[in-house]
Swiss-Prot record:
InterPro entries noted in UniProt: ACT-like_dom_sf, ACT_dom, HD/PDEase_dom, HD_domain, NT_sf, PII_UdlTrfase/GS_AdlTrfase, Polymerase_NTP_transf_dom, UTase/UR
Lineage: Bacteria, Pseudomonadati, Pseudomonadota, Gammaproteobacteria, Vibrionales
Similarity remark: Belongs to the GlnD family.
Encoding gene, per UniProt annotation: glnD
Cofactor: Mg(2+)
Keyword Endoplasmic reticulum: no
SUPFAM superfamilies: ACT-like, HD-domain/PDEase-like, Nucleotidyltransferase, Nucleotidyltransferase substrate binding subunit/domain
Domain of life, source organism: Bacteria
SMART domains: HDc
Keyword terms: Hydrolase, Magnesium, Multifunctional enzyme, Nucleotidyltransferase, Repeat, Transferase
Protein's name according to its UniProt entry: Bifunctional uridylyltransferase/uridylyl-removing enzyme
Amino acid sequence: MKYLSPLSLSDTQLNITELKQQLTLFSQYQINAFHQHKAVSDLVFERSHYFDQLLSRLWQFFKFDDIANTSLIAVGGYGRSELHPLSDIDILILTENNTNDTFCQKVGELVTLLWDLKLEIGHSVRSIAECIEIGQNDLTVATNLQEARYICGNKELSHQLKLKIHSDSFWPSESFYQAKIDEQKKRHSRYHDTTYNLEPDIKSSPGGLRDIHTLSWIARRHFGATSLLEMSQAGFLTDAEYRELLECQEFLWRVRFALHIELKRYDNRLTFGHQASVAEHLGFIGEGNRGVERMMKEFYRTLRRVAELNSMLLKIFDQAILHQGEQDDAIIIDDDFQRRGRLIEARKPALFQARPDTILDMFLLMANDSTIDGVAPPTMRQLRTARRRLNRFLCEIPEAKEKFLQLTQHPNALNNAFSSMHKLGVLSAYLPQWSHIVGQMQFDLFHAYTVDEHSIRLLKHINKFSDTTNRDKHPICCEIFPKIMKKELLIIAAIFHDIAKGRGGDHSELGAVDAYDFCISHGLSKPEANLVSWLVKSHLLMSVTAQRRDIYDPDVITEFAKQVRDEERLDYLVCLTVADICATNPDLWNSWKRSLIADLYNATQRALRRGLENPPDLRDRIRHNQQMASAQLRSEGFTQWEVDALWRRFKADYFLRHTHKQIAWHASHLLRHQDKEKSLILISKNASRGGTEIFVYSKDQPHLFATVAAELDRRSITIYDAQVMSSKDGYALDTFMVLDQNDDPIDEERQQRLIDQLYDVKLNDQATHIKTRRPPRQLQHFNVKTRMEFLPTKTGKRTLMEFVALDTPGLLATVGATFAQLGINLHAAKITTIGERAEDLFILTSDVGGRLDDDKQAELEIALVKNVARLSS
């Protein structure tokens, strides 16, 4: 059944039931047309035209034409004739001297009918004088009025309003420009000034539709241009820029139209819950999340293009039109470039096309002069043109190769040259591999940025290691980085570390090959190329070892040291690792990770200096820890006999797994503890190893770990590491390293409350009821398959279990309870959260103390999959 033109509807058909049916038919027609690939620009204009007809017909039905000096005006996006399925329909009822009861009643009836039809109507009733007065004091109203478009009623009245709005007295062009620039800056800051947000807003994110609107509003105010085409005809855009903006707008409109098809209520955020369905509407398909990632890659690239055009065109408008003749004097730098104020400028109009390698010269000059903080708008425009006309990548030009290598060696290039090269599309023009990762995202909560943005942020973090003010946050890297002789090798490794993402296969392996080829083609020696290639191949090695292995096990350190081989590679790797973690997600680096990386670095450095053929003697380590702890305890007034009597209850493993400070702390409180059968809970007053340490002494019970984990989870406290052991006489000696919900150590004020809360849960209970928090909204849109892998230990006496699952509240407690139910002993846990994924390591033994046999492993796997599934149901 086809919808009818609203103008053809009779008075008897203008009832809610009939109109709702017509609106449904029209909307369904548009959805079908969208899926049949009708141009979205036609659809949004068509939708606007449909509502023009509907409102005109209702205007006639309510006899507004009988009222003199009244007209119906479309404003805002509706005024631009741009309506998406859930767009607001903003109207202005313009009237002069019509405020009587009859008029007000008609307006009320019209608006009520539109609301009853579930339309998002924004309406105002004003005179011309009121419009001007309010608009002069309200930028949003002024902007909406500027887009006013006549629908029906008194046309002359609408014309008079337009004359007033477009007069110089109503928001002069320069004032309007500055107000819109300030408005855009505030809007961009709400989105962290980046086009790369995990759940971007199609309309308001930097590079979104609002950036195109800002250009059109400013051009409309100054030139009277009402479309991108008219902006081009007015000379504000070149033909190429006009076509590019039109192409970007068309894509963003298609994404927005598809999103509105999916939603029931107005929203422009491309949330995780809707990215997959929008991708499907747009025809982006692929295995797993490939369709979403392909769509988002195109989306981010489009935002990037719009943001670049927006920035350049607004600067051109400011300099060439508003402030023509007011520019700073040019200071000549060399034959090709000059500086004007704080901007660098090409001295010849076709410099980059004639000699493409001079593009690199510009960034070398920026690195040389810290007072230059940008590129002049005409030079940006020239660069964009030259970039598009290149018939080969810049890395294929020998002169450009030499200059790029100079940039990697320049001490100031990390500060702004590389980020500017990326922002202006030069890295993509230089490296073919880089052009493939621009906009490449991963559909998860772990990677906050696209691959290209992450890599640029990594370079910036490396630069921070040369600033001594960052020593507290990055003590090892700030100590090491200034001493690294060939920093360019680290920079090249940083550029290539993720460059093969999105290709399929192991990105570390593929990137290592690319990095080696790059180094050789740029004249580096084979040993240098091998080092860079190894760094790219191994860039995850240190973080994985620190976070998912027991780095206090000498065997783990020996194995890691064998892969690193020497201190030079260790120094390069730790700088790359820390910068990589910091650049992945702003919330990822914390005191706990800093402590883990530092402990792994220091232990590996000691192993390399001692020689891998000389492993440490574990008995010496036990004696050392006992001697140091004993001295501390004697200074507190305890006798050696008391200390020895306590320690005779402990197994040798206890003295290996704890530092002498931890051992002394535990003993000091246990020796004062009057009733040894009563539980004791300690919380460290000072942050230890980057977190808060909780020590639990209690009669050992199967569910003890699960009980503590469940209670901590309920309090939004995260366990990062756990040592689970028992004394010879059956008492638990469990240590939990924890952080609060902000990834900070537990503050002192909260510590006593937490101790009381843990005592209240009755640690000696045989079973625990796991109460879980509500999972975050974003988790609902991810499906991480629960899986585990069992690995033997070097001695063969224990089993390592690598465990992966959706990081649902209550997960760790559920895992612990499952161990207890099956009679499996837990000895240690390393807890790692990677976005929506939990990737944990557990060290286990059977109920008789040996490794888990195949049958027990199978039983555990079935039970864990079943119990974890219950958490999400």
